[in-house]
């Protein structure tokens, strides 16, 4: 719910409009890393397969050397950044970058929503909007934004229609729900830590 508006409302409140995702933020596909650049260590690169359950699985990421990651400097991500799969059977799925200390970049065909230097300040509204049924359906392979080949372009995504509330309502929503999104990210980071501890314990047990 945004202010007094609900999904059952037949009319938009004063100051609200039907806009597009592109009216809220820019979207671009990630960097096309060369196959020979992949390494076992280095900076993590987020691929489509790493977008899981509205989060990012950082432990399964491939890596590139720092000098190659630097070529994609426009696609370094921060905690709170939102990413979207742009091709394949999982087209349209989204994930929020969890809390982490690593330098991470985005691979080609993973879209990044550009929310500024402090993405968490704008992420709650976008995250909620992208999960809203009418919007998410347009981003799925059988929706109207993509093609028969299950592909989305940045323009496809930016053109998807959304309800755009008054600026003050958006700011209030983001402020109110920022801590909720932080909690989700912290929980995902904790799950990641516990998973690593589990792997260590299992390795020690099996080595006895």
Regions found by a protein language model. Give the residues of each.
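Short, surface-exposed loop/turn microsegments at beta-strand edges and helix-strand junctions
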Residues: 35-45, 58-64, 74-77, 95-108, ...
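Short, ligand-facing micro-motifs at secondary-structure edges
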Residues: 51-64, 82-85, 89-107, 124-128, ...
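Short, conserved charged micro-motifs
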Residues: 119-124, 167-171
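Terminal anchoring/processing modules of extracellular glycoproteins
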Residues: 114-117, 127-132, 136
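A short glycine-rich beta-alpha junction/loop motif
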Residues: 104-111, 144-171
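Sequence-specific dsDNA recognition surfaces
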Residues: 19-37, 49-81
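Non-catalytic DNA-recognition/assembly elements of restriction-modification systems
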Residues: 1-30, 159, 163-208
């Amino acid at each position: 719910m945004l202010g007094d508006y609900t999904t059952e409302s037949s009319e938009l409140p004063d100051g609200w409009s039907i806009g597009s995702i592109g009216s809220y933020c820019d979207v671009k596909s990630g960097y096309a890393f060369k196959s020979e650049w992949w390494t076992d260590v280095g900076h993590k690169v987020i691929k489509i397969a790493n977008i899981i359950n509205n989060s990012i699985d950082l432990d399964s990421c491939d890596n590139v050397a720092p000098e190659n990651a630097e070529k994609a400097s426009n696609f370094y991500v921060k905690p709170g950044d939102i990413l979207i799969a742009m091709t394949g059977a999982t087209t349209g799925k989204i994930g929020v970058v969890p809390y982490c200390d690593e330098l991470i970049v985005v691979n080609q065909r993973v879209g990044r929503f550009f929310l500024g230097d402090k993405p968490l300040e704008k992420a709650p509204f976008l995250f909620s909007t992208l999960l809203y049924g009418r919007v998410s359906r347009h981003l799925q392979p059988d929706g109207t934004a993509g093609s028969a080949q299950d592909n989305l372009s940045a323009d496809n995504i930016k053109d998807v229609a959304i309800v755009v509330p008054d600026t003050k309502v958006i700011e209030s929503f983001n402020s109110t729900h920022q801590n909720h999104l932080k909690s989700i990210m912290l929980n995902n980071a904790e799950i990641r830590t516990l998973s690593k501890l589990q792997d260590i314990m299992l390795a020690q047990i099996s080595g006895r």
